[in-house]
Amino acid sequence: MGIIERIKEIEAEMARTQKNKATEYHLGQLKAKIAKLRTQLLEPPKGASGGGEGFEVTKYGHGRVALIGFPSVGKSTLLTMLTGTHSEAASYEFTTLTCIPGVIHYNDTKIQLLDLPGIIEGASEGKGRGRQVIAVAKSSDLVLMVLDASKSEGHRQILTKELEAVGLRLNKTPPQIYFKKKKTGGISFNTTAPLTHIDEKLCYQILHEYKIHNAEVLFRENATVDDFIDVIEGNRKYIKCVYVYNKIDVVGIDDVDRLSRQPNSIVISCNLKLNLDRLLARMWDEMGLVRVYSKPQGQQPDFDEPFVLSSDRGGCTVEDFCNHVHRTLVKDMKYALVWGTSTRHNPQNCGLSQHLEDEDVVQIVKKKERDEGGRGRFKSHSNAPARIADREKKAPLKQ
């Protein structure tokens, strides 16, 4: 019996089993078995060659967005309108057979947009080219799930199920569960929050299913069995997703209003070029990109080439800015002068941990510059008060 058949057999058993207090331990074990089998399904077969065409393209720009959806929902047309890159579009299905990249120039940043082939139900099991499509989606910073507003709402659930089957968690955050394997000592189970979905006994059974007999487990929130399995697997990708309903020009106003009110959703029409500007703004907000401008000593800020940080990847602190400029700048920095909305006054003397916001201006003062320049360095800043110069340290008073 193959892996896919075993997964379907366990799913059928779960569907037959009534959910109650007496069967929750058995269902938890079945969920762990399915998670293990799906992980094996994604592993490449032993001895397989590297032949075959893949979809992976070189990352470019300050972020990557993947277009996911069923065939003929308007992904290629959307790519052409947002990037100017030509992607073959037609009225028949499976027009796009490979990954077509494009670049969006927005707010002085470059965002890579990938038009992926349409996926079908069963893509997580290898049908069509679903595995390759989903693998590229895992490397993206944001997923745009393009849906046909005139089709059934079931398409959204099918696509979400296929993505979650391969370890993608849409619009979720990693569960607050600490898990660490040990060589000896048995299983240590602790919790700092009341648990209503899982208990110590079920936790032990799931760990034994993975043949883990020595580990430390700490629940910091009311997590579920699926959350605990995700932590054990350790290969889940938590990614933001925006549900883009296209072709709203062929449905009624009531349907448009209903779809637009759904969480993480936006309605557009590629045919009428409707709401595309709001889609770009939504993409920008979801990706959490932050532009930071550098200001050399005694010069005007460079507003042409910002340093782009991300709140999701890495962070948005002065230390992150220094690492973007040069890896040795953190060691050489004395302090930073920051102008912008993240400070109480302009400029503000800040350290490495200062959080930066969009369009902040940063000037790094190095240790050598401060030692050589002395107090006169601060006189070049028109906004700095006269008392900003360092005060000499006085010896403590004698008792």
Swiss-Prot record:
Expressed in actively growing tissues and reproductive organs. Mostly expressed in leaves, stems and siliques. Also present in flowers and flower buds, and, to a lower extent, in roots. GO terms for molecular function: GDP binding; GTP binding; GTPase activity; mRNA binding; phosphatidic acid binding. GTP binds at residues 69-76, 115-119, 246-249. Keywords: Cytoplasm, Cytoplasmic vesicle, GTP-binding, Lipid-binding, Nucleotide-binding. Residues 367-399 are annotated as: Disordered. Transmembrane segments: none annotated. Disulfide bonds: none annotated. It holds the Pfam family MMR_HSR1_Xtn. The keyword Cytoplasm applies. Residues 288-366 form the TGS domain. Belongs to the TRAFAC class OBG-HflX-like GTPase superfamily. OBG GTPase family. This is Developmentally-regulated G-protein 1. It comes from Arabidopsis thaliana. The gene is DRG1.
